[in-house]
Amino acid sequence: MEYNPTILRAVHWCRKKRIPFISWTDGTLNSEKNIGKVQRLSRSYIIKRAAAFVASSTASKQAQIAYGADEKKCFLSYLTVDIQKYLREKEDYSGRELLYVGSLIQRKGLDLLLPALAETSEDIHLTIVGEGQERELLTEQAGKLGITDRIRFLGYVEGEPLRELYHNADVFILPTREDCFGLVILEAMCASLPVIASKYADGAFDLVAEGENGYIVDPEDTHAFAEKIDQIFADENRLKEMGTRSYERAHAFAFEEVAKGCIDALCYVMGKAVR
């Protein structure tokens, strides 16, 4: 939920009318590490008065508990996409192609990925999908690192062309400095892609099973980041196994599955047995 004056008034009204309310958030301790004292107090005020809590990730749940939520009243309802639009099995992982999808802004950490890419095998390439104010700086950085010929900037892509890019890639990579969830990881998993995700993509800890369908890395450790990229491409058969595992794990994030957390929270507040 948004923590603004309107929400605070709504909470006060619910309390006055004795109407229970549910707090929902995708915020995490990482994404909210720089908020001010007043914002922290407002979060605590709301959460301590909520009848139940819905969190969009395990990290969001941990944040609500840190603000005073009762863990027994917390329910997970993951953020998701229409997975049916993206689900696609894949057989060929021989292209050695990394894919990034997202904005070209400082927060997304592409400036951390490029030095790592420069340390990897020269036959590994990167396709960057998205637009943003950092594009010129990233182009210059790639030139200085001598990897211009290993990178494609495709600009903004959506719909079926984007789904084709997912399908034609071999590994998805998200080097973000901060993301509450990282829905592009789930899109890539639906397309049977192994994933290398930043530890600052808070949803990655729910989406990526370490060593099974990908890896979670510290994007600020350039050498370790590069090693993980080389490692994931080292065995094509293993890469295919990881892609298959991504495809299988993605099904747990179908609408009907993630909605269960919201339904359970409503049932709890209404006094019914949680399924």
Tell what function each PLM region has.
Residues 139-157:
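Nucleotide-activated donor-binding/catalytic signature segment of Leloir-type glycosyltransferases, i.e.
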Residues 90-117, 127:
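Conserved donor-binding/catalytic core segment of Leloir-type glycosyltransferases
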Residues 194-198:
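Short hydrophobic beta-strand element within catalytic cores of glycosyltransferases
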Residues 156-157, 164-169, 262:
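Short alpha-helical donor nucleotide-sugar binding micro-motif in glycosyltransferases
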Residues 177:
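Aromatic "clamp/platform" in nucleotide-sugar-dependent glycosyltransferases that forms part
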Residues 43-88:
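Donor nucleotide-sugar binding/catalytic pocket of nucleotide-sugar-dependent glycosyltransferases
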Residues 4-5, 19-37, 49-52:
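A short, histidine- and acid-enriched strand-loop-helix "catalytic/donor-clamping" loop
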Residues 10, 210-211, 215-222, 231-236:
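Conserved acidic donor-binding segment of nucleotide-sugar-dependent glycosyltransferases
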